[in-house]
Amino acid sequence: MSILIILIISIIFYLIFDFLYKNFSNRQFKGPLALPLVGSLLHLKDDTHLVFQNDSKLYKDGDNNGKIIKYWFCDQLTLAIYDTNTMKEIYLKNPESLNTRVKSPSTNVIGNRFRGIVTADENYWQFHRDILMKSFTGRKVKSLSSSIEKETIDLITYMKFIEKSGQSFSPRSNFMNFYSNIIFDYVFSRRIENIYEGVNEEQGKVLLAIRELFDYLADTLIVNYLIFTKPFYFLYLKMFGHPADSLKKILTKYYLEHSESIDLNNARDVLDSLIIEYRKVGGKEEQSSIIPMVNELILAGTETNSSTAEWFILTMVNNLDYQDKIYNELKSTLETTTAMIKLSNRNQTPLFNAALKEVLRLYPPVPFGVPRQVNQSFEINGGSLKIPKGTQIIQSLYSIFRDENYWDSPDQFKPERFLDQDSHSNNYFPYGIGVKNCIGMGFSQDELYISLSNLVLNFKLLPLIENSKICDKPIFGFSFKPNEFKINLEKRNN
């Protein structure tokens, strides 16, 4: 028998075994048919959020009642959680069993061997979270609101120029630059763009590097999940480079500048704080850990809030009656016509607060949460279900936030549902749940509150064509965002 025939027979046997294993193991969980090699990825390839939502209804007849559904991301067993009580049992009662991330070649390279914060494994996650929390509560944070206010004033000034010149306004590019400036000032004490002066060569490289990495992260690469391709793909990335490399080079330059000029008794920003905290424990792996940490802070701090701001603007344009109500509420809180909305006004703007919550419910920026991997098996549901070691756990937030069992008219924009502070609090967690929720939640909420409230206060946000609606069909990338759109601005006479 020739080697070729043996090889063909071996491949056929492997494909048969792979098909049987994926579909007949872990049978306590139901899920779609898994194909050899690719698993469930073809099932999920189009409008993934809607496929997940439909699956939650399709598999409601089993013991799990659609609460947990099994998928295979190539060779990676994945359980999607569709029920808030099940999610709380997993994340709140078993946090020690979810102490790591899925270790793919891409997360290995981005996290520099899993040393980041989003990509951190069980060896780094707790320490890195602790020192980041110290950085977020340090001296620099006290001036964060003033930084957001300054950037907001600059953006509004630019928007007034756009409105006066009769141009349309592009939320995507402007919000990306706006939120990038805030996070760069917070982390590095520098801006990356001045709206009026344009972008210099170095700033252009920063923006390009960020966008290239976003584009890469938008794709689910099969080679990240197939057992036999992982080592070869990792070797390829190390030999020929990764889209994260360009941004890492720039961040390394910023790190070295800070390292040389740092005052260990007076942190200027988050990067200084991280360096100081690492040197308190001897500085081991300082540079190799801090670079991926700030890299992930930049990505998360820019993309998710930029996407949320786009959804908020889209929703205001598509719901002009609510936009006017919110404007009247915001205007009534101000003592003078030249004042701006600040964090101190938050308790006086319940409708705006509810509208922002409702936008995050309808369009969660990370619709499946941040995946985690089970590092030790555990049982839930009174011991009737065992979550095996090595399983990837994802939260189907989009499905939960539109489940009619939890929400009245779940597909409609109804901010009134959040006017009662305790309403839906048990079923609403756009920033995650448990000790592993979003570390920058407060930062994000402050940014969104100051920036978006003042945009509505200063402008009537209108569609390009009168009485039309902007398409709210989302696209998937690093985050959940709308198709790119433009709007018209009409200056308010405050």
Swiss-Prot record:
GO terms for molecular function: heme binding; iron ion binding; monooxygenase activity; oxidoreductase activity, acting on paired donors, with incorporation or reduction of molecular oxygen. Its main location: membrane. It comes from the Eukaryota. GO terms for cellular component: membrane. Its EC number is 1.14.-.-. InterPro entries: Cyt_P450, Cyt_P450_E_grp-I, Cyt_P450_sf, Cytochrome_P450_fam2. It holds the Pfam family p450. Heme binds at C438. It is found in: Membrane. The chain crosses the membrane at residues 1-21. Keywords: Heme, Iron, Membrane, Metal-binding, Monooxygenase, Oxidoreductase, Transmembrane, Transmembrane helix. It is a single-pass membrane protein. Its cofactor is heme. Belongs to the cytochrome P450 family. This is Probable cytochrome P450 518A1. It comes from Dictyostelium discoideum (Social amoeba).
